[in-house]
């Protein structure tokens, strides 16, 4: 198995073609509109191939996008060429920016990929540091119910020249859902090449996340259902957090 997203990077957009980034951008803007001042600069944490960053840049925001994978950022660079986008290869828990931003967004359960609570607490502190006073931090997470429910599941994606198999295993003692991925790609000569990756996501409780945010200096912390402006339902698979840095 190779490092996460080394194999996936060039095929990630095809494998996530069902993700509605436009809806995510719309949702972010609904939260921006609730602030008492305009949002001009936005940071995306865990930007991947830059799909959300590109949309927000096209809507007029000065974007900074951070990801740990150089391969994903290479795709993002091509996608965002000509737009007001700054791309940085950084570990979220060691986040540093030359200037503050008005809002930070993080989607597609990037927070779950920080598998050590101490690292996530440090990440939240760094996010608070780079936000201007009163700034917004908006992110989503898979809930423990979602990760526990994935145990033993197999996921398939395929088309004419791509075949991908995911296997999920949940480990209760570690509170981690591990994904083993096998990717088969048809080459130009008709032969097939195979690659593999290993991913882990941590099952944070909503109470833990709320506590980490408060510890980092955030206030007015609210939870929402999946891209809706109301509280999540019991047993929700995905929850959004919106938190503000103190003025």
Predicted regions mapped to residue ranges:
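SAM-dependent methyltransferase
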Residues: 138-210
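Residues lining the SAM
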Residues: 107-109
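A short glycine-rich, Lys/Arg-flanked "PGG" loop and its adjoining helix->strand segment in the class I
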Residues: 121-133
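Conserved class I S-adenosyl-L-methionine
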Residues: 1-46
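Class I SAM-dependent methyltransferase SAM/SAH-binding core
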Residues: 51-94
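A short acidic, Gly/Pro-enriched loop at the edge of an enzyme's catalytic core
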Residues: 96-103
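C-terminal lobe and adjacent flexible extensions of AdoMet/dcAdoMet transferase-like proteins
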Residues: 202-247
């Amino acid at each position: 198995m190779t490092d996460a997203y080394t194999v996936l990077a060039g095929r990630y957009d095809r494998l996530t073609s069902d993700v509605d980034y436009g809806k995510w951008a719309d949702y972010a803007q609904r939260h921006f509109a609730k602030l008492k001042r305009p949002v001009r600069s936005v940071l995306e944490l865990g930007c991947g191939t830059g799909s959300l960053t590109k949309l927000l840049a096209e809507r007029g925001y000065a974007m900074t996008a951070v990801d740990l994978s150089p391969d994903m950022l290479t795709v993002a660079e091509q996608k965002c060429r000509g737009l007001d986008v700054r791309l940085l290869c950084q570990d979220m828990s060691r986040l540093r920016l030359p200037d503050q931003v008005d809002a930070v967004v993080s989607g597609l359960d990037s927070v779950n990929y920080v598998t050590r609570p101490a690292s996530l607490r440090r990440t939240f502190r760094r996010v608070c540091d780079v936000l201007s006073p009163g700034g917004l931090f908006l992110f989503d997470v898979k809930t423990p119910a979602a990760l526990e429910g994935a145990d033993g599941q197999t996921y398939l994606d395929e088309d004419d020249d791509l075949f991908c198999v995911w296997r999920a295993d949940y480990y209760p003692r570690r509170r981690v859902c591990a994904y083993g991925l096998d990717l088969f790609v048809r080459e130009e000569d008709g032969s097939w090449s195979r690659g593999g990756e290993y991913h882990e996501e941590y099952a944070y409780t909503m109470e833990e996340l709320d506590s980490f945010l408060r510890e980092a200096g955030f206030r007015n912390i609210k939870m929402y259902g999946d891209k809706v402006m109301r509280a999540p339902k019991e047993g929700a698979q995905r929850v959004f957090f919106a938190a503000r840095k103190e003025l």
